[in-house]
């Protein structure tokens, strides 16, 4: 037996390996988060970007200066502030100079700085750079005491912790980065809109994100495009700080002679470029079999035929005058333009999702996902602090200068006596202080100035400067002593910057339906298979033998869906309080495991679907929750247009949504039709279907009364005089019994009667 003691956590010479590894990993993770990947809410910059801007300013590379070689700038950055590889610094410089990447480029790049088609920049020895005018928004106040500095990596120089941004740059140019355990995707926004929103929030701090979206309706991308995401979805994204917007290209239809026409694409979504789109069309019109396959599958053959039937020619006519100009010519002028454009959007990157994940370093120096109001409020807090520091810094300068000038004024009024004292004194500084009441600083200044500065003309200039500085001192004291006046000053400065640097919105915000390809396959019957763990797949045909269907380990069948309305071109709904609509053609077929439902729709908080539904819009379903409430809803009211779904059934915390039950049209006119509900305590109730409301959404009415700790577990709709009860005895034996409905019939909301079973209820259904 080993009797040696274990290393103690308090032993000064040892540390448990697990604790050391945990601490080391956390330190590494936070260094990546803070030091590389995430921007600051204060100035919108990552450390390398901040160092690039500061180094270029120190080199005097302002907008009006002569540009210098990029290699020289990179050397300055690496030598003084950023001891990493030169490629990381140069790549960051290149991105900051690309007008198709940043909405407001901060570097004016001369030479080849890459293209929107993915071409790389020339080597740093060939390109030149200087700052753009808008970079002044970050740098103009750097030497006015606005921000703190810290030593660089070797202590030889100081670098700023933040840049004193005059506008919320974190929203203007956005950011993208991947850290350890987190990532950020902040899109760019319009300067005018962001500034107006910040001013509105400064004037009225009680404004919420929905109010601020009157000024900032959506992102504004450098390349333009059209955002088609609905307004309520955009609001949800800005309120939560996470989501995705749907962006499509902008185009025009050019009419030609003899009824011919063509489509000209002039603006592309982010992350799309002309070369990528041409490659996608080539892949679809001239596809190659996948590795290990001898021929194309039917889906790819259908897509090839569709694209070849629609498109005659595609040309890239982009040039210096037209950064994006893609020309699409149809096979025939008789092709419907909407069908042509919809197919292009659905099959290429002309339409796609842009992720938004508003993660950044806050003023508390912690990474967090923030909503729109929080971002603007934190930046305003930062701006108020920087302006206050700037005012105090300037006031200190003014007071020092006033002190010097007041000493000179005393000397000017007694110039002859001053000269006499200086000539005859062994200690002129002490004598000047004694005779004229000067301070040591004033006496030092008098002894160092030239006599010509005491001429009569200089006296007039002296008095003028004194008066101007006293007026400025008064204004500065007003701003520092009155928060309202300080806020007015900030607003005035923001309005001036908006007037100087603001521009029109580039990205159109206009809601539209998502482009969906509907002609790649015939409308064929399919069977959908949903597993307990939320995996879905499809099989061709109806009435299939699924007994040999395999599932992933630990998973099993939850539900199959077929019937007269389950076809490849229909949209099944997935119920879980929210309803989600999916094009059945998007669900993979074959013998594989399928895909997680969560890859097709945005389930909230790891939820799994309760059931799948399909049918005509007028089809009705009974929706209910374990809390004993429910209502009848039309399938048409459950259609959700966005991946995040549509809230239909409201359930209290801790409650679950029960599987929906179909209610056929004949049920509403049949006086014998009953809704039947059962509980976890084996009680059941039946009541006429007419006692339950038809609603579009909500919590519904009480179906059955529940005791404390009891829940509703089963529902059914039946016109039969008997109900089929399937139960499991205490020893696991299965039982099937028929129960007259009349025995449990009562008014809606009553507690019903105990079922004549000894075990647990497994199923409640109509005998037919």
From Swiss-Prot:
Domain spans labelled Topo IIA-type catalytic: 38-521
An example Gene Ontology biological process: chromosome segregation
Membrane topology: Peripheral membrane protein
EC number: 5.6.2.2
PANTHER family: DNA GYRASE/TOPOISOMERASE SUBUNIT A, DNA TOPOISOMERASE 4 SUBUNIT A
Gene Ontology terms: cellular component: chromosome; cytoplasm; DNA topoisomerase type II (double strand cut, ATP-hydrolyzing) complex; extrinsic component of plasma membrane
Organism field: Neisseria gonorrhoeae
The keyword Aminoacyl-tRNA synthetase appears for this protein: no
Subunit composition and interactions: Heterotetramer composed of ParC and ParE.
Name of the protein in question: DNA topoisomerase 4 subunit A
InterPro entries found in the cross-reference section: Gyrase/topoIV_suA_C (IPR035516), Topo_IIA-like_dom_sf (IPR013760), Topo_IIA_A/C_ab (IPR013758), Topo_IIA_A_a_sf (IPR013757), Topo_IIA_dom_A (IPR002205), TopoIV_A_Gneg (IPR005742), Type_II_DNA_Topoisomerases (IPR050220)
Enzyme class: isomerase
A Pfam family this chain is assigned to: DNA_topoisoIV
UniProt record similarity statement: Belongs to the type II topoisomerase GyrA/ParC subunit family. ParC type 1 subfamily.
Cellular localisation: Cell membrane
Site (Interaction with DNA): 46, 82, 84
Residues at the active site: 126 (o-(5'-phospho-dna)-tyrosine intermediate)
Free-text function comment from the UniProt entry: Topoisomerase IV is essential for chromosome segregation. It relaxes supercoiled DNA. Performs the decatenation events required during the replication of a circular DNA molecule.
Catalytic activity: ATP-dependent breakage, passage and rejoining of double-stranded DNA
Keyword presence, Kinase: no
GO MF annotation list: ATP binding; DNA binding; DNA topoisomerase type II (double strand cut, ATP-hydrolyzing) activity
Primary residence: membrane
Domain of life: Bacteria
Chain positions of site Transition state stabilizer: 125
């Amino acid at each position: 037996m080993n009797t040696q003691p274990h290393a103690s956590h308090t032993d000064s010479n040892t540390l448990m390996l697990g604790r050391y590894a945990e601490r080391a990993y956390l330190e590494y993770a936070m260094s990546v988060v803070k030091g590389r990947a995430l921007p600051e809410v204060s100035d919108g910059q990552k450390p390398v970007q901040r160092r690039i801007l500061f180094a270029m300013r120190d080199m005097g590379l302002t907008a009006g200066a002569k540009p210098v070689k990029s290699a020289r700038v990179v050397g300055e950055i690496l030598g003084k502030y950023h001891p990493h590889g030169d490629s990381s610094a140069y790549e960051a410089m290149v991105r900051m100079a690309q007008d198709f990447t940043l909405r407001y480029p901060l570097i004016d790049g001369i030479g080849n700085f890459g293209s929107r088609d993915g071409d790389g920049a020339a080597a740093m020895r060939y390109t030149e750079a200087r700052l753009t005018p808008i970079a002044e928004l970050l740098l103009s106040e750097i030497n006015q005491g606005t921000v703190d500095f810290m030593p660089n990596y070797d202590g030889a120089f100081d670098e700023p912790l933040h840049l004193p941004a005059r506008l919320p740059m974190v929203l203007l140019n956005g950011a993208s980065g991947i850290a350890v355990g987190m990532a950020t995707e902040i899109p760019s926004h319009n300067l005018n809109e962001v500034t107006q929103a910040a001013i509105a929030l400064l004037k009225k701090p009680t404004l919420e994100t929905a109010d601020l979206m009157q000024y900032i309706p959506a992102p504004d991308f450098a390349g333009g495009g059209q955002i088609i995401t609905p307004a309520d979805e955009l609001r949800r994204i800005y309120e939560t700080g996470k989501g995705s917007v749907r962006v499509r290209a902008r185009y025009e239809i050019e009419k030609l002679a003899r009824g011919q026409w063509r489509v000209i694409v002039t603006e592309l979504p982010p992350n799309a470029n002309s070369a990528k789109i041409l490659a996608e069309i080539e892949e679809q019109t001239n596809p190659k079999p996948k590795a290990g396959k001898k021929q194309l599958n039917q889906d790819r053959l259908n897509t090839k035929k569709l694209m070849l039937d629609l498109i005659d020619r595609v040309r890239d006519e982009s040039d210096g005058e037209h950064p994006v100009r893609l020309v699409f010519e149809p096979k025939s002028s008789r092709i419907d333009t909407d069908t042509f454009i919809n197919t292009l959007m659905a099959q290429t990157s002309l339409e796609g999702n842009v992720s938004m994940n508003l993660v950044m370093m806050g003023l508390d120096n912690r990474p967090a996902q923030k909503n729109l109001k929080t971002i603007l409020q934190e930046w305003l807090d930062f701006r108020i602090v920087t302006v206050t520091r700037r005012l105090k810094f300037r006031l200190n300068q003014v007071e020092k200068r006033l002190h010097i000038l007041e000493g000179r004024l005393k000397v000017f009024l007694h110039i002859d006596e001053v000269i006499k004292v200086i000539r005859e004194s062994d200690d002129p500084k002490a004598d000047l202080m004694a005779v004229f009441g000067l301070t040591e600083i004033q006496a030092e200044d008098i002894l160092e100035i030239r006599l010509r500065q005491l001429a009569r003309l200089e006296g007039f200039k002296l008095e003028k400067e004194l008066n101007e500085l006293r007026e400025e001192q008064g204004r500065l004291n007003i701003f520092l002593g009155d928060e309202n006046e300080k806020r007015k000053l900030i607003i005035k400065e923001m309005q001036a910057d908006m007037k100087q640097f603001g521009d029109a919105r580039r990205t159109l915000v206009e809601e539209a339906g998502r482009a969906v390809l509907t002609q790649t396959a015939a409308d064929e019957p399919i069977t959908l298979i949903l597993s307990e763990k939320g995996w879905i797949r499809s099989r061709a045909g109806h009435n299939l033998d699924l007994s040999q269907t395999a599932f992933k380990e630990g998973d099993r069948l939850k539900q199959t869906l077929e019937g007269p309305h389950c076809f490849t071109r229909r949209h099944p709904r997935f119920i879980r309080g929210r309803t989600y609509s999916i094009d059945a053609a998007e669900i993979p077929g074959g013998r594989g495991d399928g895909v997680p439902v969560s890859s097709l729709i945005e389930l909230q908080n790891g939820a799994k679907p309760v059931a799948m539904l399909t049918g005509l819009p007028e089809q009705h379903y009974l929706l209910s929750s374990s809390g004993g409430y429910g209502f009848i809803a039309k399938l048409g009211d459950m259609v959700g247009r966005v991946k995040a779904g549509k809230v239909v059934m409201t359930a209290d915390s801790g409650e679950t949504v029960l599987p929906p039950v179909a209610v056929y049209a004949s049920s509403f006119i049949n006086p014998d039709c009953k809704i039947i509900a059962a509980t976890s305590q084996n009680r059941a109730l039946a009541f006429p279907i007419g006692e339950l409301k038809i609603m579009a959404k909500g919590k519904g009415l009480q179906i059955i009364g529940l005791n404390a700790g009891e829940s509703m577990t089963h529902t059914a709709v039946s016109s039969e005089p008997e109900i089929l009860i399937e139960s499991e005895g205490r020893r696991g034996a299965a039982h099937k019994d028929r129960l007259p409905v009349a025995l449990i019939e009562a008014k809606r909301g009553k507690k019903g009667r105990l079922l004549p079973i000894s075990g647990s209820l497994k199923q409640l259904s109509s005998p037919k």
